[in-house]
UniProtKB/Swiss-Prot annotation:
Keyword match Thylakoid: no
Species, as recorded: Escherichia coli (strain K12)
Cystine pairs: none
Protein name as it appears in the record: RNA polymerase sigma-54 factor
Keywords assigned: Arginine metabolism, DNA-binding, DNA-directed RNA polymerase, Nucleotidyltransferase, Sigma factor, Transcription, Transcription regulation, Transferase
């Protein structure tokens, strides 16, 4: 065996901490970014937040091209030094059209959030505490509430509840009596044993003079399976009800809630703050960043000026390190916002027909289309469109919403899956309720409009819209 030395030249991309920070900030949602910046403000004394209600002195800044995130991901290093007076204003105005302040309609932007985090069990137990139960009945009520699932149904037999209490002096009749009291709690119908029981409990709360009440009770008690199958012909025959009477009774039943527990929201609150604002001005669609969604940062000049006057090397190093971290963070935010604005403008430009006329006019578009237009990598587009939201006159949409697959048309063109879903929804909305359109018929109608799509694809689109099949949509006219 012969030993020797060999020289080999190769190139390798090094992921510096600064590049990692730029990538991480790019994929954060607005809420996550706010939390990240708040942590930075608390840990880095060289960073400070600009009070948007105070006048900010204009500072001279060095002229330089904005570094977009795509370049940042491809370069091995970012510049070693940044201007000492780098502030949020010098960064943010580059991405906001002149003459606009980032304010929206009435200076207010909607913040969408979920409902209360209170669980159904919490809500029921609150009512138990307010109800004049004896100690024994309260123990029974607690066991019953524990056996209720999130949809509001009882999940175990009463015999099991009785056994779990472990009191030989309590009998099944007493458990049944407490159950009936709980079933009158809000939401009405909770703790029902099955669907039939749930609906009948809700009907029992109606005034006895309510029209069609007895007919509705008859259908639920004896013919719920026929109603579930929309077999109205057989239902009219076995109940001997005329069509108009049956229709009214069915309408009353449909006003009931088959899952009463779900009216109590149990999920964590979800907030959506728009990152991008889109509006039409003088006949043109304008795109700007939401300047109110992210804290505005700048270098703390007082602490920065102490860098060269520190008492010892340790203090000097601490200030220099935090100063550089602050500069990198501001630069990374500049990169993030520039990328977000460029991509958003490109999306709006490509999908102008959607903003003008709605979902039916959505163009097929994939990540590669935008990546090519803005000269960035697809992975960058994916990061910047995930959990980023756009506010427009048509509503709030995640940027990823505007990307969809294509379907060939008869004329050799393409239609987006989003547009086809909108057409399916429109066709179903206009159908005869007594003779709803089957998936095959929908496929045929789309074909007449030049859109060639398989029946199973239509079924998939219909299901994605939470629209039941035709046999379940059938109604009495």
């Amino acid at each position: 065996m012969k030993q020797g030395l060999q020289l080999r030249l190769s190139q390798q991309l090094a992921m510096t901490p600064q590049l990692q920070q730029a990538i991480r900030l790019l994929q954060l949602s607005t809420l996550e970014l706010q939390q990240e910046l708040q942590q930075a403000l608390e840990s880095n004394p060289l960073l400070e937040q600009i009070d948007t209600h105070e006048e900010i002195d204009t500072r001279e800044t060095q002229d330089s091209e904005t570094l977009d995130t795509a370049d940042a991901l491809e370069q091995k290093e970012m510049p070693e030094e940044l201007p000492l007076d780098a502030s949020w204003d010098t960064i943010y105005t580059a991405g906001t059209p002149s003459g606009t302040s980032g304010d929206y309609i009435d200076d207010e932007l909607p913040v969408y959030q979920g409902e209360t985090t209170q669980t159904l069990q919490d809500y029921l137990m609150w009512q138990v505490e307010l109800t004049p139960f004896s100690d024994t009945d309260r123990a029974i009520a607690t066991s019953i509430v524990d056996a209720v699932d999130e949809t509001g149904y009882l999940t175990v037999p009463l015999e099991d509840i009785l056994e779990s209490i472990g009191d030989e002096e309590i009998d099944i009749d007493e458990v049944e009596a407490v159950l009936k009291r709980i079933q009158r709690f809000d939401p009405v119908g909770v703790a029902a044993k099955d669907l039939r029981d749930c609906l009948l409990i809700q009907l029992s709360q109606f005034d006895k003079t309510t029209p069609w009440l007895e007919e509705a009770r008859l259908i639920i008690s004896d013919h719920l399976d026929l109603l579930a199958n929309h077999d109205f012909r057989t239902l009219m025959r076995v109940t001997r009800l005329k069509e108009d009477v049956l229709k009214e009774a069915v309408n009353l039943i449909q006003s009931l809630d088959p899952r009463p527990g779900q009216s109590i929201q149990t999920g964590e609150p979800e907030y959506v703050i728009p990152d991008v604002l889109v509006r039409k001005h003088n006949g043109h669609w304008t795109v700007e960043l939401n300047s109110d969604s992210i804290p505005r940062l700048q270098i703390n000049q007082h602490y920065a000026s102490m860098c060269n006057n520190a008492r010892n090397d340790g203090d000097s190093q601490f200030i220099r390190s935090n100063l550089q971290d602050a500069k990198w963070l501001i630069k990374s935010l500049e990169s993030r916002n520039d990328t977000l604005l460029r991509v958003s403008r490109c999306i709006v430009e490509q999908q102008q027909a959607f903003f003008e006329q709605g979902e039916e006019y959505m163009k097929p578009m994939v990540l590669a289309d935008i990546a090519q237009a803005v000269e960035m990598h697809e992975s960058t587009i994916s990061r910047v469109t995930t959990q980023k939201y756009l506010h427009s006159p048509r509503g709030i949409f995640e940027l990823k919403y505007f990307f969809s697959s294509h379907v060939n048309t008869e004329g050799g063109g393409e239609a987006s899956s989003t547009a086809i879903r909108a057409l399916v929804k429109k066709l179903i909305a206009a159908e005869n309720p007594a003779k709803p359109l089957s998936d095959s018929k929908l496929t045929s109608l789309l074909s007449e409009q030049g859109i060639m799509v398989a029946r199973r694809t239509v079924a998939k689109y219909r299901e994605s819209l939470s629209i039941p099949p035709s046999n379940q949509r059938k109604q009495l006219v």
